[in-house]
Each structure stands twice: as structure tokens, then as C-alpha cells.
């Protein structure tokens, strides 16, 4: 027993040391957008501070789960006067000129007219240094969508003028914009002359009819105040209107927040969830209206307990979506404040939990996660303004990104959330097919590293109890109003060690050959990250690469095994040394012994 105790002590020591809280990064500025700017497969953060946008490169190796992540400031470029209010700035990223480098679409809200002035900043290399050049785009009603409308693989700008008429443009190699034919009139069939856009709500680019091809959903406001989702489906000819989603009337729900998109009940169909508010400010959320293709409008319970919610100025975005618990049911995050006096806003994870007593045969409900998050010192002393999910170590386990004010400055930090039990995940990232020098698969990089907006994927597998698990999601379904969707798809596989039976991937492109827009992968090992490249002019076939991420339990087990081996080696060395010492002593005794035979 005494010999076993040291080994048990070492195991506990290693397990404890590997589970210690790592020091999370803390940076100055307001989060503007996410993207992989330097093609190293890590998600970087575009930050606005004092009139300047700065790319903060995340430095962490894909398989190095022991090293804490850190951010290094990179290219900076001034977009306004230093005194500009950060609440007036919005960003979205994409490859607008087809050079496989991330460009930045910036909109600045005019304080008087409430119109957004859009400027495209294109990335270029000059004298081996990255620079960003500005090109004025348009004055629009709110921040525009950054999606590929024309099927050429380049990111286009789709928005609305202040009078409600559509603005749609693509760009050439030099970055200068070219209006598409009649402002997208040939891309959209019988598009209305004007739409009354619902202010503060991001438009969506998601699959609503389960064909894995993303549809465009414009958030509009009817004359009676109803929220109407104008859906446009990609067809062989053009984008065509589809009257799929019935409007939400003020008689039913007079006040609503910005919709979010997820497969809430993990049935293989995407759901649109609209927060139902008690008042126009949306401080109190009572429940969520849920729409899907087969179930139409229903209700999902949302238990906020005694908390009110905090949203940003000029925006109706309340919740942000992510697979936090990795149980195949997406969760949400919200900034909330207790109703009792002298309380500060806090970040809360809304667990997607099973519901057995929900109305109208509902099966899921959202409830505040019981486990409290330990905040860093500055964050706990500051005033929290915004929160979202972020994968700090690129290990498939989502952490919390928190933006707050402290000492008169806007800052953001992170809360590490590594303990997800023995759950597994599948991480999928679909890149654009338009490439330059980054499209030759090398040992450490593949493709353009630019996430394709609207790429959708679904998976199916057998769980540990003999049942089936499935889910569907679309990559970056919204890019305006600081929706801050991460540039990849993350699926929780629960506690099942089984392989993923099938993964279906599709890009928002209509083609006669199914192989041109859809691809399937089978028998995928859990805890994997898959990078997918659709067909392009350079490479006419689908390309994929799989990276396996070891879980924390595996790392701890390997560390314990290594320490035990070291202990055994030390014991062997010690016994060998003692044996040699005894042999030397015996030889000395032999040399001093009197030999009677010699007499």
C-alpha cells in the first residue's frame, strides 16, 4: 500500500495542475468582427479603438492544448477620428476582390441622419507589409449583408438605401465596386421597389427548406408593425421570393427582438427563434417564438428568472448562439442584470434543456445555467456590455468573450470554460473556392482560410444508447448588427465515443450537377476538425483535411503515464546503482581476504 500511495498522489497532482485556471487574455477596444486574417487556422479578432481598426492574431497551435492562447496586435488602419463613439461602428469581413485575403466592410452611423456610411477596406501586400486601402461604397439604412449573391465566389454587399430600395454590388480585382446589372434586378426576380426594413435586426442567410442551400431572409416591418421575414430562394435562374414564414402580428407579439438561428431540438431542421419581449426596449423576455419548415410557428420557453436583459444601442440583438455544452443542442449567451438593487450586469449561458411540461408539445426550453462563471479581476470590477462565444484554444470547447467598460475604457476579456466532462465534438469549416497562392494544400495550410458565408452542413450518428443524433447548422448566418457568429460550425456529439456516420456539406450555389454544390464524408472520428474546400477553377473536386484534437482527459492520462514511467525508470536506475555499489564492495572484500592456498 505504501508503494501505491506515491503513484496516487502523482496522479492527483498532475490532474490538478492540468485543470488549473489559465490566465485569459485581456485587450483594449471593441470587438468588431472575427476571421482568420493570416491563414493559420486560428480565429483572429478585428478590434476598434480610438478611431483605428487593429487585427489581433490569435497564437495557439491546433493540437497544443496545454499552452494558453494569446493575441498579438498586427496590422492597424485608421477609419475615423479618435473621438468617434465606438457604438457607431460596425464591421464585417469577406473576400470582396477575389485575392483570397480578408477585406473589411466598415459602416459608420451618422449621429444626425442615422444613416450608415459604408467603406470597403481591401487588404494588399506592399513592400512585404499588409496595408488596407479604402473604397467608398454607399450610404445605407443599416449595416449591409456581406454574402455571395452572384455565385462567383466573391463576397458582395447587399443592403438597402434609406428609402427602402435595394443596394447590391460586387467588386473587381482593384477593389472598386461595380453595380450588378440594374442593382441586382437580374439576380432577384420581381423584387419589390422598396422594403420597410425592421431597424436593428440582422438579415439572415440560412437554409429554411432542408436542402442545405442557404436562403436570404430580409427582416421587414409591415405597416401594422408585424415582423415579416421576406425569404428568397436560390434557383437555377435567380433568387425568387418564397412565402414560407407567416408574419408575427402585433396582436400576437407586440414587441420582438432580433431572431437567432439554430437546430433547437436537434431534429435536422433549422429553427428561427424570435425573442418575445414585454416592452419595446426588450428588457424582459417572456418566451421565444420558434419557426421551422414542418412545425411552423410554435413557442419555446425561456426562463430568465428574476433577470432583465441588456442589449446594445441601435440593435435588437439579445442572444448569441453556440454549442457550449456539446450535447448536440445549441445554447445561447445573454447579458443579464438582476432586478434587485445595486447589481451589475453579468454574462449568463442559457442552457438548451429538455422540457417535459411545455406548451403545444414543446420539447426544449432555455434556462439560465446554474454554474457561475469566475470572472477575471478587471472584468468583475467593470460594467459588462456584450458577451458571445469564442473558441480560445481552437480545441472545440467554447469559452466566453466578454466586452466591458473599466477605467473609462472599453475592453474585452475571456472566461475559460474547459470543463465539459467527457463530451466530444465535430468542428467543420468551409472555405471559399476562389483562391490565389493559398490554395495549394501544404503541410500546414489548406485553401483560402476565408469562411464561406451561408455554407451549411448536417451530420448524423448513432449515440451510446442505440438511438440517433443529428443536427444542422449554417456558417455565419448573419454578419451585421454585431451578431458575431463564429467563422466555423461546431457540433456537440454528447458523451458518445461513436464515429459520425455521415456529414453532408453544401455551399450556397445552384448547379445541375449535385457534386458541384454538395459533398458527403463518412465515418468521422469524434473530436475532429474538418476543413473543406469546394470545387474551384484550380481544383475541380472537393478537398477536405481532418485534424484530430486530443481531449483534456487524454492529455492528463498521457502525462500520468509519462510520470509513472519516469518513476519506474528512477527506481530501476536506483536499484542498478545499489547493485553496482554492492558488487564493488564485494570485490574490495575479495581483494583484502587472506589466501591460505597461496601459503
Curated annotation (Swiss-Prot):
Gene: lnkn-1
Signal is among the record's keywords: yes
A GO term from the CC aspect: apical plasma membrane
Main location class: membrane
Full protein name: Protein linkin
Keyword terms: Cell adhesion, Cell membrane, Glycoprotein, Membrane, Signal, Transmembrane, Transmembrane helix
Disruption outcome: Hermaphrodites are maternal effect lethal and have elongated and strained appearing distal tip cells with abnormal migration. Male animals have detached gonadal cells that do not migrate leading to a partially elongated gonad. RNAi-mediated knockdown results in a mild defective gonad phenotype with 11% of animals having detached gonads and 17% of animals having 'stringy' gonads.
Extracellular face of the membrane: 20-553
Transmembrane intervals: 554-574
Keyword Transmembrane helix tagged: yes
Function recorded in the entry: Probable cell adhesion protein involved in gonadal cell migration.
Originating species: Caenorhabditis elegans
Tissue expression per record: Expressed in all somatic gonadal cells including distal tip cells, anchor cell, uterine precursor cells and spermatheca precursor cells of the hermaphrodite. Also expressed in the pharynx, pharyngeal-intestinal valve, intestine, excretory cell and canal, seam cells, a subset of hypodermal cells, vulval precursor cells of the hermaphrodite and hook precursor cells in the male.
Cellular compartment(s): Apical cell membrane; Lateral cell membrane
Cited InterPro entries: Integrin_alpha_N (IPR028994), Tip (IPR024881)
Amino acid at each position: 500500500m505504501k508503494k501505491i500511495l506515491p503513484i496516487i498522489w502523482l496522479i492527483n497532482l498532475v490532474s490538478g495542475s492540468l485543470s488549473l485556471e489559465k490566465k485569459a487574455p485581456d485587450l483594449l477596444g471593441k470587438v468588431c468582427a472575427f476571421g482568420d486574417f493570416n491563414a493559420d487556422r486560428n480565429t483572429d479578432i478585428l478590434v476598434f479603438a480610438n478611431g483605428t481598426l487593429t487585427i489581433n492574431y490569435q497564437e495557439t497551435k491546433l493540437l497544443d492544448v496545454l499552452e494558453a492562447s494569446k493575441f498579438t496586435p498586427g496590422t492597424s488602419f485608421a477609419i475615423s477620428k479618435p473621438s468617434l463613439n465606438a457604438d457607431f461602428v460596425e464591421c464585417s469581413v469577406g473576400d470582396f476582390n477575389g485575392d483570397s485575403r480578408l477585406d473589411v466592410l466598415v459602416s459608420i452611423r451618422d449621429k444626425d441622419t442615422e444613416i450608415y456610411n459604408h467603406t470597403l477596406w481591401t487588404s494588399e501586400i506592399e513592400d512585404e507589409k499588409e496595408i488596407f486601402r479604402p473604397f467608398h461604397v454607399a450610404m445605407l439604412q443599416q449595416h449591409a449583408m456581406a454574402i455571395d449573391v452572384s455565385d462567383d465566389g466573391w463576397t458582395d454587399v447587399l443592403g438597402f438605401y434609406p428609402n427602402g430600395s435595394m443596394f447590391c454590388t460586387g467588386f473587381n480585382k482593384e477593389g472598386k465596386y461595380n453595380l450588378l446589372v440594374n442593382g441586382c434586378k437580374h439576380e432577384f426576380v420581381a423584387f419589390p421597389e422598396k422594403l420597410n426594413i425592421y431597424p436593428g435586426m440582422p438579415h439572415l442567410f440560412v437554409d429554411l427548406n432542408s436542402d442545405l442551400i442557404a436562403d436570404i431572409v430580409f427582416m421587414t416591418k409591415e405597416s401594422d408593425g408585424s415582423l415579416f421575414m421576406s425569404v428568397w430562394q436560390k434557383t437555377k435562374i435567380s433568387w425568387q421570393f418564397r412565402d414560407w414564414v407567416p408574419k408575427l402580428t402585433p396582436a400576437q407579439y407586440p414587441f420582438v427582438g432580433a431572431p437567432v438561428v439554430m437546430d433547437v431540438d436537434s431534429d435536422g431542421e433549422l429553427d428561427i427563434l424570435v425573442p418575445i419581449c414585454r416592452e419595446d426596449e426588450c428588457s424582459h423576455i417572456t418566451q421565444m417564438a420558434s419557426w421551422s419548415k414542418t412545425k411552423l410557428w410554435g413557442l419555446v420557453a425561456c426562463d430568465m428568472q428574476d433577470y432583465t436583459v441588456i442589449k446594445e444601442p441601435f440593435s435588437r440583438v439579445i442572444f448569441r448562439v453556440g454549442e457550449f455544452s456539446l450535447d448536440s443542442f445549441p445554447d445561447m449567451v445573454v447579458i443579464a442584470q438582476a432586478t434587485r438593487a445595486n447589481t451589475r450586469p453579468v454574462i449568463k449561458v442559457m442552457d438548451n434543456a429538455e422540457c417535459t411540461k411545455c406548451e403545444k408539445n414543446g420539447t426544449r426550453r432555455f434556462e439560465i445555467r446554474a454554474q457561475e462563471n469566475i470572472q477575471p479581476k478587471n472584468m468583475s470590477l467593470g460594467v459588462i456590455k456584450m458577451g458571445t462565444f469564442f473558441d480560445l484554444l481552437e480545441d472545440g470547447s467554447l469559452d466566453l468573450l466578454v466586452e466591458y467598460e473599466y477605467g473609462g475604457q472599453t475592453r474585452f476579456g475571456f472566461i475559460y470554460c474547459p470543463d465539459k466532462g467527457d463530451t466530444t465534438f465535430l468542428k467543420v469549416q468551409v472555405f471559399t473556392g476562389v483562391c490565389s497562392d493559398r490554395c495549394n494544400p501544404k503541410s500546414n495550410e489548406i485553401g483560402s482560410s476565408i469562411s464561406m458565408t451561408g455554407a451549411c452542413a448536417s451530420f448524423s450518428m448513432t449515440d451510446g444508447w442505440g438511438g440517433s443524433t443529428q443536427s444542422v447548422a449554417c456558417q455565419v448566418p448573419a454578419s451585421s448588427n454585431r451578431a458575431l457568429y463564429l467563422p466555423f460550425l461546431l457540433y456537440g456529439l454528447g458523451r458518445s465515443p461513436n464515429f459520425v456516420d455521415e456529414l453532408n456539406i453544401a455551399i450556397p450555389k445552384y448547379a445541375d450537377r449535385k457534386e458541384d454544390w454538395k459533398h458527403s464524408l463518412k465515418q468521422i472520428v469524434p473530436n475532429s476538425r474538418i476543413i473543406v474546400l469546394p470545387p474551384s477553377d484550380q481544383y475541380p473536386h472537393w478537398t477536405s483535411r481532418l485534424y484530430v484534437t486530443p481531449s483534456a482527459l487524454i492529455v492528463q492520462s498521457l502525462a500520468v503515464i509519462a510520470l509513472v514511467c519516469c518513476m519506474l525508470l528512477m527506481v530501476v536506475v536506483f536499484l542498478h546503482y545499489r547493485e553496482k555499489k554492492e558488487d564493488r564492495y564485494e570485490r574490495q572484500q575479495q581483494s583484502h581476504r587472506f589466501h591460505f592456498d597461496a601459503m
